[in-house]
Design a protein with these regions (language model features):
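N-terminal secretory signal peptides that target proteins for export/translocation
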Residues: 1-10
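Extracellular carbohydrate-recognition regions
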Residues: 23-48, 224-225, 229-238
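Extracellular beta-strand elements of beta-rich domains used
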Residues: 32, 210-214
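Carbohydrate-binding surfaces in secreted/extracellular proteins
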Residues: 32, 97, 158-191
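Extracellular glycan-recognition surfaces and repeat-rich motifs
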Residues: 38-74
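Secretory/extracellular carbohydrate-interaction modules
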Residues: 73-136
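Short, aromatic/His-centered strand-loop micro-motif at the edge of beta-sheets
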Residues: 137-159
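Flexible glycan-contacting loops in extracellular carbohydrate-active proteins
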Residues: 183-210
Length: 244
């Protein structure tokens, strides 16, 4: 379904079509294409102060694609943590994103970040090649979930889906080049914890992030983007169509 936009100055051979797709439940989306190279991403906020060399860079693997290189020194207590700044009041949500591990170390993302060093962590374990869930609070760590041994190859793009629902969390992942829908994949990690009831999504440690989408329903991922660098623009706002 579509509607012709009103009040525009139309060229006789062109008009705008605005698709009537609802994105009311999309809390946040960013593919970093509007950010300046070598600067922090403008749509993100610092959720935890620390050493900060974060910046948007050219994708080392996919030409002409911009990605977020998060602070390289965030290891337990040194570097900054960046958050989306749009999900602080969010209790339940889904997140889809692409992530590249530049080196073999402990790194990943935070969710239900409630401020400072109070958050849940999903990270890649250097010594086990697993994904783990951790709670960080008052400078202490508590593990509450560990996956089987996974590939988790460095310098390679992976696609993730995180489900945050009540006290229960699950993670699905795949090679970013694979077209298999997340709906057809089984979780690689599941865990439960009841400490933090709401909070934001963000980075942890040195990772490259791209095509980050936070939404309240899986249906909202139908077309915020195709999660792919070759088609990472939103097609739901408008298109220009030539009329012969």
């Amino acid at each position: 379904m579509y509607a012709v936009s009103k009040g525009a100055n139309f060229h006789p051979h062109y008009f705008f079509i605005t698709f009537a797709t609802s994105q009311a439940e999309i809390l946040f989306k960013d593919n970093f294409e509007g950010d300046a190279i070598d600067n922090p991403p403008k749509n993100w906020a610092v959720g935890l102060e620390g050493l900060d060399d974060s910046k948007v860079i050219w994708d080392p693997d996919r030409p002409k694609n911009r990605v977020f290189s998060s602070p390289t020194e965030r290891h337990d207590a040194k570097g900054a943590v960046y958050i989306t700044g749009k999900g602080k009041g969010g209790t339940d949500y889904y997140v889809q994103w692409e992530m590249l591990y530049p080196k073999d170390f402990y790194m990943g993302i935070v969710f239900r970040h409630t401020g400072g060093e109070a958050f849940y962590l999903l990270d890649r374990r250097q010594n086990t090649k697993k994904l783990d869930f951790w709670k960080r609070q008052k400078a202490k760590w508590e593990n509450f979930g560990s996956s089987a041994v996974l590939d988790l190859e460095i310098e390679k793009w992976w696609s993730f889906q995180l489900k945050v629902s009540g006290n229960d969390f699950e993670v699905k992942m795949k090679d970013s080049e694979k077209k298999t829908p997340f709906a057809k994949l089984k979780p690689v990690l599941e865990g439960s914890h009841n400490e933090f009831k709401k909070g934001d999504f963000g980075n942890y440690g040195w990772v490259l992030l791209d095509n980050v989408v936070v939404a309240t329903e899986l249906a909202d991922f139908s077309n915020p983007w195709v999660i792919s660098p070759v088609n990472s623009l939103s097609t739901s706002w408008a298109v220009i169509k030539r009329v012969d």
